Amino acid sequence: MIKRKKNLKGFTLIELLVVVAIIGILAAVGVTAYSGYTVSAKKSTTKSIHAATMKYIAAEWQKCSMDPEGIIMVEDKATAAKQISCSTQGASDVITLLTTEANSPLQDKDPYDNGYAIVATAPTGKAVAGNVVLTSSGKVITLTTCYAINNADDGCSTAADDHKEATLTNTVTLD
């Protein structure tokens, strides 16, 4: 009787283990790359919100030079809380309007915690990143934005933390 060797088809255990190991390595690299991408996207979004807020304030206030008795930042003409008069109101009124989420024409969300991005009081700890903090002094509005928290996750990055500043500061003068 002649014995014939059956031709077995399939994968060996070693081959399967090699494939699983390769998939694990690729997944680890992918997660790390994706994590870096999301951090970068949050920083870019925060910088964009800062720039948009600054441009919005400057553009709206520029309208007052064309019509000193006009009304700006109008979202709802019927609601006085949602508008500013060029002749009687100033920097603190602009800040109050923009930082009151229900009244503000700007509805940007903080990319770090999905809260309202434009605030009048600087948050502390992890919440500091992603907010545009508006403060006033006379006719000057200062916008300060932290776009990256430090290594300890308890505040904005500084030169000592990450060897670079992670804060944007701009001013808009209301004349």
Label every PLM stretch briefly.
Residues 23-27, 50-51, 102-106:
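Alpha-helical interaction segments
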Residues 12, 29, 44:
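Conserved Walker
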Residues 1-11:
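N-terminal leader/signal peptides at the extreme start of proteins
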Residues 17-33:
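Alpha-helical hydrophobic helix detector
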Residues 9, 15-18:
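Internal alpha-helical transmembrane segments of multi-pass membrane proteins, especially GPCRs
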Residues 39-69:
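Membrane-proximal N-terminal amphipathic helix
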Residues 62-175:
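Periplasmic/extracellular, small/polar-rich flexible segments of pilin-like filament-forming proteins
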